Amino acid sequence: MKNMLLLSSSKYKNTGYLEHTLPWLQNFLADYRGKTIAFVPYAGVSRTFDEYEKTVQNALSDLGMNIVSVHHGKQHRDIIEQADVISIGGGNTFCLLKQLYEHNLIDIIREKVNNGTPYFGWSAGANVAGASIMTTNDMPITYPPSFQALQLFPHQINPHFISGKMQGHNGESREERLAEFLLVNPTALVYALPEGSALHIQNEMATVLGENPILCFSENMECGTFDINTTFSY
């Protein structure tokens, strides 16, 4: 059974790193205590892989699991193949996807998750689980071989969604950017995840977790809203 937890962000309001996600992760991974999580740190542009791994190990120590970054493997896919759970951290989605292709991890992650290995990711790690990364918010832009992502979730994801414009900001709002995307890609669906929200995916069903409803935008910016604790098919 496909089992994924897609988190909008690593923090919510004034909480510590991944602190608000711990109750969800403890429930999500209740049967995996003592098992191994393969962690993919590629999105962390401003820190080393070792630093990112240590940050996540400290934040998730209460899970009682062994968190190992893929960069410790002779081949990075070795760590993925041996792991009980797969996790991808947030940061820069372009850098993340580029290195997933470079290290030949796309197919092995897709295969394992489709065959029941639990997957969780936040921010870029949620974005890359979708159909493509074409609704990322990120800079700098590096060029992966394709914008097609893991396609574990068949639609677009936009993490860190904030509605409207900040005072003094004269550029496009997030809604305006997504409307432009849907003009160019009219058959797409975009799931917008506000801060502090998450989707728990089980096969073709999704449950909304967190503090804010999740939005789904389609052609002409038709908007569906999925309230907290709602379960829906996608």
UniProtKB/Swiss-Prot annotation:
- SUPFAM superfamilies for this protein: Class I glutamine amidotransferase-like
What GO molecular function terms would the record report?
dipeptidase activity; serine-type peptidase activity
Q: Which Pfam families match?
A: Peptidase_S51 (PF03575)
| Enzyme Commission code | 3.4.13.21
Q: Which residues form the active site?
A: 123 (charge relay system), 138 (charge relay system), 160 (charge relay system)
Q: Which reaction does it catalyse?
A: Dipeptidase E catalyzes the hydrolysis of dipeptides Asp-|-Xaa. It does not act on peptides with N-terminal Glu, Asn or Gln, nor does it cleave isoaspartyl peptides
**Predominant subcellular localization, coarse grouping:** cytoplasm
- GO biological process, alphabetically ordered: proteolysis
Q: Where in the cell is it found?
A: Cytoplasm
- InterPro entries, alphabetically? Class_I_gatase-like, Peptidase_S51, Peptidase_S51_dipeptidase-E
Query: What Gene Ontology terms describe where this protein resides (cellular component)?
Result: cytoplasm
Ordered alphabetically, the record's keywords are: Cytoplasm, Dipeptidase, Hydrolase, Protease, Serine protease
- Disulfide bond entries: none
Q: What does this protein do?
A: Hydrolyzes dipeptides containing N-terminal aspartate residues. May play a role in allowing the cell to use peptide aspartate to spare carbon otherwise required for the synthesis of the aspartate family of amino acids.
Protein name as annotated:
Peptidase E
| Organism field | Haemophilus influenzae (strain 86-028NP)
